[in-house]
């Protein structure tokens, strides 16, 4: 899966809840179409957007990069995220490794930063070698090795009772798809207000991935009597980038399903509930995504994600339907390994907000193909229960 091939430079971008396809040469901004209405929303993406941006004045400005990886032969995976919150003086650094025996290695840190010059904090470094084509991920540090990943629902206890082991990551990402997304703006160049939103810009791309992930000591026996694990990765993954003001509590819930089958077939399905409008009316959850067919993205015009749940309200399986202009898809998913994470924030008036994010490596099947990916479910927790999960 490690091959690289030339690709058309195209994007599927979102604006105002709708998405359209556009393409252009590399050196130009990508816009969905020539607009005459200055209030029309277009999507722009430039090669320099792969670099870090000058932070907005908003206290909650976030610039983040996320990359996942899955090796279908080894049935292992992982994901890596670095979010610079320079106006708050720290980054958010996450490393998550799904081991072949069901254990999970996880680390979260908030290393101090005083600038937004690079994606490099807490031992995790994400480097853009060539915009839209080639990135690398390295990590040198520790992870908490969990026999039972569900223990991370109480992170203080999980980090206090499970062993910390060395972890080394060296991964090389090469594009196998066009770009998806960008920065929505008005056609006349005005920015769209996102102070209380989730991000003002976001894009994604499927990649081939090769490299090595080592968890524990590869030679000696680790603290719980098992050898360390060395995984020579030859697989695929999805990467994304976001920037702009972000609170994890800005959305009511979402379901995000990136998945890979082979270099010619991959997809991402997303359903987002943004809650109640200012006038008190309910918003309809928005569906979006893309399907990689060959070296082209087909826009998802509609999709549904139904899930089975365990007693903790965590996803265990999925049945999905997606529609593109070309055809319909049915996808099933089975959770292989899941770790629950959380984000908490106190509002200026003293309200305690609690967000749960369940991060599950998931086996997917579609059209006779078997693949791997994530099922990432975010929910605000209200009265002790995730709001988008049926009781």
Pin down the residues of each PLM region.
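Short, Lys/Arg-enriched N-terminal segments with co-localized hydrophobic residues
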Residues: 17-29
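Structured soluble/peripheral alpha/beta segments that form catalytic or ligand/cofactor-binding pockets
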Residues: 26-391
């Amino acid at each position: 899966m490690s091959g690289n091939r030339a690709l058309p430079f195209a994007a599927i971008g979102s604006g105002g809840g709708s998405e359209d396809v556009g393409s252009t040469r590399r050196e130009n901004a990508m816009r969905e179409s020539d607009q005459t209405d200055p209030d029309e929303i277009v999507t722009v993406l430039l090669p320099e957007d792969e670099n870090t941006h000058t932070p907005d004045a908003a206290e909650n400005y976030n610039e983040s990069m996320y990359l996942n990886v899955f090796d279908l032969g080894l049935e292992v995976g992982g994901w890596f995220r670095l979010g610079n919150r320079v106006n708050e003086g720290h980054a958010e650094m996450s490393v998550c490794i799904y081991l072949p025996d069901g254990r999970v290695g996880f680390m979260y840190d908030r290393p101090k930063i005083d600038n937004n010059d690079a994606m490099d904090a807490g031992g995790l470094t994400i480097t853009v070698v060539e915009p839209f084509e080639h990135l690398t991920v390295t990590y040198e540090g520790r992870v908490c090795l969990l026999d039972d990943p569900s223990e991370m629902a109480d992170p203080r206890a999980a980090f206090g009772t499970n062993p910390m082991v060395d972890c080394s990551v060296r991964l090389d990402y090469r594009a196998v798809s066009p770009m998806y997304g960008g920065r929505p703006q008005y056609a006349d160049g005005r920015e769209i207000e996102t102070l209380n939103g989730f991000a003002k810009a976001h894009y994604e791309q499927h990649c081939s991935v090769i490299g090595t992930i080592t968890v524990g000591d590869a030679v000696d026996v680790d603290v719980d009597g098992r050898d360390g694990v060395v995984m020579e990765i030859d697989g695929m993954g999805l990467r994304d980038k976001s920037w702009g003001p972000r609170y994890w509590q800005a959305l009511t819930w979402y379901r995000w399903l990136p998945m890979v089958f082979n270099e010619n077939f991959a997809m991402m399905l997303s359903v987002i509930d943004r809650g109640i409008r200012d006038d008190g009316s309910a918003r309809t959850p928005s569906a979006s995504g893309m399907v990689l067919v060959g070296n082209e993205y087909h826009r998802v015009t509609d999709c549904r994600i139904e899930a089975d749940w365990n007693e903790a309200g965590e996803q265990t399986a999925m049945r999905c339907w997606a529609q593109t202009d070309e055809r319909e898809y049915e996808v099933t998913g089975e959770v292989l390994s899941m770790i629950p994470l959380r984000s908490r924030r106190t509002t200026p008036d003293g309200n305690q907000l609690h967000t749960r994010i369940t991060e599950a490596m998931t086996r997917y099947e579609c059209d006779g193909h078997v693949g791997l990916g994530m099922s990432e479910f975010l929910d605000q927790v209200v009265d002790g229960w995730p709001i988008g999960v049926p009781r």
